[in-house]
Amino acid sequence: MQYVKTYLSTAPVLAAIWFAILAGLLIEINRFFPDALILPYV
């Protein structure tokens, strides 16, 4: 039961860290390459 409590307490923390890193990465990509969702050569 101790391992279940440990897992439930660390998984949300790891998910929050991962989503924060991913959001920062997407923000920086959009800063250097704006409007990447639009295909300009079509």
From Swiss-Prot:
Residues passing through the membrane, by range: 7-27
Membrane topology: Single-pass membrane protein
Major subcellular location class: plastid
A Pfam family that the UniProt record links to this protein: PSI_PsaJ
Family statement: Belongs to the PsaJ family.
Function of the protein: May help in the organization of the PsaE and PsaF subunits.
Protein name: Photosystem I reaction center subunit IX
Lineage per the UniProt record: Eukaryota, Viridiplantae, Streptophyta, Zygnematophyceae, Zygnematophycidae
